[in-house]
Amino acid sequence: MEQSFIMIKPDGVQRGLIGDIISRFEKKGFYLRGMKFMNVERSFAQQHYADLSDKPFFPGLVEYIISGPVVAMVWEGKDVVATGRRIIGATRPWEAAPGTIRADYAVEVGRNVIHGSDSVDNGKKEIALWFPEGLAEWRSNLHPWIYES
């Protein structure tokens, strides 16, 4: 099954949004396969956001990610990357659809609460970076109540 990397950013952690965000993914029927509560080192943040290193906002983004703890997670399920992006909402909170995480909780693009993989391939890269030790193997007993096969 498809996997996606999801990170609750420092503002989401500080604002006490961890439980609600996890609940949204669980209620959709996705499986939590890995989770870490951690502080991010500068070099690690730079590596994670390397594709944005030429952007003018890159230094501020790195400072933001290292400013406090994050919750790094791997979610698994059918079409979890695309569906996860819909649950999260547009990068710019004012463009996010009502009911999405960013529409509900974010005001500024620089404090937009959450990161989610934007493609299956990027998800694989992010998961390998953040979870080099691997993931928990398990399947919920609810699987047949969520998926047809």
Curated annotation (Swiss-Prot):
CDD domains: NDPk_I. Its cofactor is Mg(2+). Its EC number is 2.7.4.6. It catalyses: a 2'-deoxyribonucleoside 5'-diphosphate + ATP = a 2'-deoxyribonucleoside 5'-triphosphate + ADP; a ribonucleoside 5'-diphosphate + ATP = a ribonucleoside 5'-triphosphate + ADP. GO terms for biological process: CTP biosynthetic process; GTP biosynthetic process; UTP biosynthetic process. One of its GO terms (molecular function) is metal ion binding. Induction: By salicylic acid, benzo (1,2,3) thiadiazole-7-carbothioc acid S-methyl ester, jasmonic acid, and abscisic acid. SUPFAM superfamilies: Nucleoside diphosphate kinase, NDK (SSF54919). The active site is at H115 (pros-phosphohistidine intermediate). ATP binds at K9, F57, R85, T91, R102, N112. It is an enzyme of class 2 (transferase). InterPro entries: NDK-like_dom (IPR034907), NDK-like_dom_sf (IPR036850), Nucleoside_diP_kinase (IPR001564), Nucleoside_diP_kinase_AS (IPR023005). Keywords: ATP-binding, Kinase, Magnesium, Metal-binding, Nucleotide metabolism, Nucleotide-binding, Phosphoprotein, Transferase. Disulfide bonds: none annotated. Pfam families: NDK (PF00334). Belongs to the NDK family. Homohexamer. Major role in the synthesis of nucleoside triphosphates other than ATP. The ATP gamma phosphate is transferred to the NDP beta phosphate via a ping-pong mechanism, using a phosphorylated active-site intermediate. This NDK is microtubule-associated. PANTHER family: NUCLEOSIDE DIPHOSPHATE KINASE. This is Nucleoside diphosphate kinase 1.
